[in-house]
Amino acid sequence: MIGWLHGQIIDKHQPGKLVLDVNGVGYDVETSLNTFFQIENGNQPIGLHIHTIVREDALLLYGFLDKEERSLFRSLIKVNGVGPKLAMTVLSSISPKEFIQCIHQENAALLTKLPGIGKKTAERLVVEMRDSIKQFDGSVSDTFQKQAGSTHSQQEAISALEALGYKPQEAWKVVNKIDNGNKSCEQLIREALQILSSR
């Protein structure tokens, strides 16, 4: 199974779909809009955490900038009646933090406002994901809460570090530590990489 791809984007015209060139081989990868719009156009290589689904007639690759979003995707597709397409729709329509809060608060009514989610599916999500989202309590939810108060440069730097394979909470800690409020995104990334690579 493919779990990670690192390469250069050669096609990114349709939201949620891209082609990643890895050593001369182009991989069709589907992403959530959350991941898609964090990826900047350009020649910089990126890394994506991949979930692979093998079917008789297709090999489907779903890509995520951070492991936590991929883990949330995997938890979603375990719910009865939720397939990869609907899971991607959910992750494209609501942030991981907001989704986790909905499950914690058993807010099925808000979930029904998401595309493709009816009342029964929303209730099933709340019931079946109650236990599985506990793994995210110290990662996704905290990370998104902390990033909410970050500067734009910090958020850009954190996203770039995540794309390079660093964990969101690890990237946030380092960027927050070195930022004095006056540094550009490029400076933050460069200094953060120096610290992270020396560990």
Curated annotation (Swiss-Prot):
One GO BP on record is: DNA recombination
Region of interest called Domain I, as start-end residue ranges on this chain? 1-65
Q: Where is this region: Domain II?
A: 66-144
Subcellular localization, as worded in the UniProt entry? Cytoplasm
- Please describe the quaternary structure of this protein: Homotetramer. Forms an RuvA(8)-RuvB(12)-Holliday junction (HJ) complex. HJ DNA is sandwiched between 2 RuvA tetramers; dsDNA enters through RuvA and exits via RuvB. An RuvB hexamer assembles on each DNA strand where it exits the tetramer. Each RuvB hexamer is contacted by two RuvA subunits (via domain III) on 2 adjacent RuvB subunits; this complex drives branch migration. In the full resolvosome a probable DNA-RuvA(4)-RuvB(12)-RuvC(2) complex forms which resolves the HJ.
In the record's own words, the domains note is: Has three domains with a flexible linker between the domains II and III and assumes an 'L' shape. Domain III is highly mobile and contacts RuvB.
Matching entries from NCBIfam families are given as:
ruvA (TIGR00084)
Q: What does this protein do?
A: The RuvA-RuvB-RuvC complex processes Holliday junction (HJ) DNA during genetic recombination and DNA repair, while the RuvA-RuvB complex plays an important role in the rescue of blocked DNA replication forks via replication fork reversal (RFR). RuvA specifically binds to HJ cruciform DNA, conferring on it an open structure. The RuvB hexamer acts as an ATP-dependent pump, pulling dsDNA into and through the RuvAB complex. HJ branch migration allows RuvC to scan DNA until it finds its consensus sequence, where it cleaves and resolves the cruciform DNA.
Return the protein name: Holliday junction branch migration complex subunit RuvA
Organism of provenance: Legionella pneumophila (strain Corby)
Q: Which gene name belongs to this protein?
A: ruvA
